[in-house]
């Protein structure tokens, strides 16, 4: 039964993924495949925003999130040494060894023709809840009192600092949960920090 999943001639070893005989016929094969998850298109997308003003100070924020969505990691994210690549940190910390028998991921294995013999089948091990909550924007500003500006012929001056993508709460490792590209080959959302002035004449 293992050969159908991993290829003819494969010898099961300690640390390989264990498969469930879903149909209960004593054989693990393609008939045991089943649907899992909600897909990688979120069923719920939401935002939370707010603002506060006190005297000359102002504050605003925007949270963005998604729910009821999942992502299946594949490619270089879950395949150690894929295409002569590196070893993702999650494999270093959480792959099976004789000293770490309760690890989340299967054992590390050598690469053959650019594809590792580590089990990379479509299994629940690599399926993650891709729900997330991200602080998309936060800004603090201060408007100078008009009496300070009379001599400069300026009617208004506001100083502000803001940040984008400051932090994200998510269970997905290695990749940006907002990005449905599941192999980690695209850049994540970048943090950005700005300081600025708004002038009125």
Regions found by a protein language model. Give the residues of each.
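Membrane-embedded beta-strand positions in outer-membrane beta-barrel channels/transporters
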Residues: 47-49, 137-141, 194-196
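C-terminal beta-signal and terminal closure region of outer-membrane beta-barrel proteins
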Residues: 1, 87, 95, 101, ...
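Outer-membrane beta-barrel pore domains and translocons
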Residues: 53, 64-66, 162-166, 200
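Conserved small-residue
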Residues: 1-38, 100
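Outer-envelope beta-barrel architecture signal
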Residues: 44, 55-57, 131, 153-157, ...
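Repeated loop/turn-to-beta-strand initiation elements of outer-membrane beta-barrel proteins
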Residues: 56-61, 147-148
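Membrane-embedded beta-strand positions of outer-membrane beta-barrel proteins
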Residues: 61, 159-161, 197
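Extracytoplasmic gating/loop element in the C-terminal half of outer-membrane beta-barrel translocons
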Residues: 8-13, 66-158
């Amino acid at each position: 039964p293992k050969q159908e999943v991993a290829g003819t001639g494969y010898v099961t070893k300690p640390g390989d993924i264990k498969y469930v005989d879903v149909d209960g016929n004593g054989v693990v094969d393609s008939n045991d495949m089943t649907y899992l998850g909600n897909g990688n298109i979120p069923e719920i997308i939401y935002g939370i925003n707010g603002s506060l003003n006190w005297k000359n100070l102002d504050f605003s924020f925007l949270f963005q999130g998604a729910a009821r969505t999942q992502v299946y990691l594949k490619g270089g994210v879950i395949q150690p040494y894929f295409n002569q690549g590196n070893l993702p940190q999650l494999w270093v910390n959480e792959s099976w060894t004789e000293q770490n028998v309760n690890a989340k991921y299967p054992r590390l294995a050598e690469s053959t023709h650019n594809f590792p013999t580590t089990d990379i089948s479509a299994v629940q091990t690599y399926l993650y809840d891709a729900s997330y909550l991200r602080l998309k924007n936060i800004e603090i500003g201060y408007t100078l009192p008009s009496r300070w500006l009379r001599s400069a012929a300026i009617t208004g001056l506001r100083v502000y600092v803001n940040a984008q993508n400051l932090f994200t709460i998510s269970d997905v490792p290695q990749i940006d949960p907002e990005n449905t590209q599941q192999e980690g080959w695209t850049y994540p959302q970048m943090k950005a920090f700005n300081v600025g002035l708004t002038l009125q004449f």
